[in-house]
């Protein structure tokens, strides 16, 4: 089976030739730019030939939708930091 056949078998309740496999890791030097992250993840997957890709954006990416202020560095050795949380008081819950 190729990776697509393997995943389709699992999703349809059939037994694959083996368990689909993937690994993931945070790619801090790319994860703050969607295009760079997608390209890096595809390259990573092609290099190791896993069955599927799990995207790994930086951990706080969804919090900015609620008003969290993030400090973004685009640095291989420095991850995104929360500069100001969306909620710092009970009153903030009414706002969001």
Regions picked out by a protein language model, each given a short descriptive name:
Residues 1-96:
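Catalytic cores of TIM-barrel enzymes
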């Amino acid at each position: 089976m190729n990776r697509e056949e393997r995943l389709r078998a699992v999703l349809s309740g059939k037994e694959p030739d083996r368990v689909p496999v993937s690994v993931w890791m945070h790619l801090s030097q790319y994860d703050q730019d969607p295009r760079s992250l997608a390209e890096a993840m595809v390259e990573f997957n092609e290099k190791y030939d896993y069955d599927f890709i799990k995207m790994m954006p930086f951990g706080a990416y969804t919090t900015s939708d609620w008003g969290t202020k993030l400090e973004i560095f685009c640095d291989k050795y420095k991850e995104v930091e929360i500069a100001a949380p969306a909620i710092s008081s009970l009153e903030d819950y009414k706002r969001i």
